[in-house]
Amino acid sequence: ACYFSSIDVYSIYNNAILKSKKNTISNIVGLSLGLSLQFIIAHNKYNPIYLSIPIIITTFIPFLVRFISFHKMKIVKQTTVNKKIKYNRYILSSGLSIVFSSLSIAIYTRINQFMISYLDGEYSLGIYSVAIILSSSWAFVLTSLISSTLPSIFGEKDDNRAIKIGIKLNIIIIVISLFVLSFILLFGEFFINLLFGEKYIPAYSLLKILCISTMFANLGTLSARFIIRSSGYSFLSKKMFIMVLLSIPISYYLIKSYGLIGAAYSVLIIEFLSLTLMNYFFKNKIIWKLHIATLKMNFK
């Protein structure tokens, strides 16, 4: 599943040419098939190893759809060797910081799982994993929205105009997240029982908290794009390294003291710090300005 996600450059291409609708549709198809298979496997009590199939399908189907769609298009001109070398150098120099930042994110989001397994046992880890899966299953909608607006944000030379676009997107992210949270509050317990069984009902209390964490994470993604827009690659990599270091004591203390609820709250705290305080040290305080303007709903 991770392999298909990592080689899926076609989603980036669709976002760049303002056709993120293709990404959204293919993601919905993949997610629907994945969840349907999960339900069939859980309902019929098949060997849990079969749950790896829907996980793979969730990323493979969108990749396959985008791959076929891309190769049906007529790609125009070939670039010269010199331009390719120059472009590859630029990708390498600017991309290494982003790679390090992404690795840091992957590490600090997994720290909780290691600590739950160590401090609370495998059953608790299973409950937490279910909550994580469901709380992030809808995030592709927000990711598509963010990606589709990136060209307009990166293409805008004036910071104030870029911030106005960011304000609107922040509000859309918050509204969609609150709608999903309301749905989870009403039907979350029912769907956990339907998809995973009665033993995983305790995941419901975690799901509500982790859903808010998902909102913060996506608001943080938008803020990170503003930082990249200002060439803050080095800042991002340093920030995420600090977040990894911070997440270890926070996760350990909360999990040891409060168990699974503590684990969920540790994610919430880390995502909130990453979104707010840690971003406010960036030059010109552009993220601070973005957040204050969002709270005031200042579109002027």
Language-model features and meaning:
Residues 3-25, 155, 212-239:
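Membrane-interface junctions at transmembrane-helix termini in multi-pass inner-membrane proteins
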Residues 16, 135-160, 226-229:
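Helix-loop junctions and terminal segments of transmembrane helices
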Residues 21, 48-55, 64-109, 155-164, ...:
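Interhelical loop/hinge segments that connect adjacent transmembrane helices in multipass membrane
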Residues 24-73, 132, 242, 260-283:
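Hydrophobic alpha-helical transmembrane segments
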Residues 42, 103-137, 192-198:
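Helix-terminus/linker motif at the lipid-water interface of multi-pass membrane proteins
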Residues 48-49, 53, 86-98, 116-136, ...:
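Interfacial/gating helices of multi-pass transporter permease domains
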Residues 60, 97, 112-114, 124-142, ...:
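Alpha-helical transmembrane segments of polytopic membrane transporters and translocases
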Residues 122-124, 186-215, 261:
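Interfacial segments at transmembrane-helix termini and the short loops linking adjacent helices
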